[in-house]
């Protein structure tokens, strides 16, 4: 299941986002969206989890949680 994450702090790394979701199950991919020219974060990302049940549990657990000073906004993509 693909999960859309927004309101990411610009300093958050792929490995930090991965670490948050790994606590709730298997993660197959993590991507943080960046502007091509500047290479800076768009404050959004995608997390792919093979298990829908684990993905829904991760969304419920992480919705509104603080990560790097920003409150996460998460939904199914």
Segments from the language model and where they lie:
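Canonical RRM/RBD RNA-binding surface and closely related RRM-like beta-sheet modules
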Residues: 1-76
């Amino acid at each position: 299941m693909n999960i859309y994450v927004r309101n990411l702090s610009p300093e958050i790394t792929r490995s930090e986002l991965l670490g948050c979701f790994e606590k709730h199950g298997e993660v197959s991919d993590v991507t943080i969206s960046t502007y091509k020219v500047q290479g800076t974060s768009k404050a959004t990302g995608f997390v792919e989890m093979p298990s829908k049940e684990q993905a829904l549990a991760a969304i419920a657990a992480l919705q509104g949680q603080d990560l790097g000073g920003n409150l996460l906004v998460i939904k199914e993509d």
